Amino acid sequence: MTASYEDYDTAIKAFWAGRDLQAQKQSESGKTDAGTRGSVTGGLHLSALQELIAREFLPLADLGATVRQSGIIPLPGYYRRAKNWDVVVTYNDILVAAIECKSQVGSFANNFNNRTEEAIGNAVDLWRAYEAGLLGKTRPWLGFVFVVEHAPGSTTIVRDQGKPLYSPDPVFDNSSYTRRYQILFDRLVRERLYDAACLISSAKGEGIYDEPLPEVSTRNLTAAITGRVAYIQGLA
């Protein structure tokens, strides 16, 4: 199955509905997290997106591949024992794909660096594990899908606090958090930390508002997955 723009748009709408449902359940239980955490700590808000991505690998199931996108799916690390990934596809001893799905809604100043460090660190750890012989002989394929809320906090120019001891890359000057995510994922893919990435901007409660960078769009992600599926089919 090849996912369309409309499929992703529907999955993003389900993302917002899932957040609202989880926040409601927490409120009814009387156990409410601070800020918007109650919308995400249930763990299901990105399930529609994960299921859509997993379905794109289903042609490999006919070959005996296993497609996982629910529950706990740990892969070995190098600097830590293991890390759970959102979508994992395996065929014999080949790690066909490992894909992470993340989002940021509000709290942009507080969480941007955390999201950046996660994206970089997870990839570095997995590639080092592969180099150490922990993930088979065939090169794995890594993907990252990120949903950022389209809101004033993500689209206005960041007023950075403090002056760095050395001059930062000027590409970050006068940029919003959404623009900084564009730079992050573009560089992660260009430098092969990830084989494909997708950055989606969405206003609260709606579908896709924008895909700010064509190189990290739903179309490019789908094309990259199609290429990976064809490669594994060729090996089989």
Where do the model's predicted regions map?
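Interdomain/boundary linker segments immediately adjacent to catalytic/signaling cores
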Residues: 1-69, 75
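A short, flexible beta-alpha/helix-coil linker loop
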Residues: 103-107
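Acidic, metal/cofactor-coordinating or nucleic-acid-engaging core segments within structured domains
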Residues: 109-210, 214-215, 219
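Charged, often glycine-rich, active-site loop that binds/positions anionic groups
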Residues: 71-87
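Low-complexity intrinsically disordered segments
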Residues: 54, 58, 203-236
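Hydrophobic, Leu/Ile/Phe/Ala-enriched alpha-helical segments that form helix-helix packing faces
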Residues: 49-61, 123-130, 180-192, 225-233
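Phosphate/oxyanion-binding active-site loops and adjacent basic polyanion-contact surfaces
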Residues: 42-50, 80, 111, 115-118
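Active-site beta-strand-loop-beta-strand hairpin of nuclease catalytic cores
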Residues: 88-98
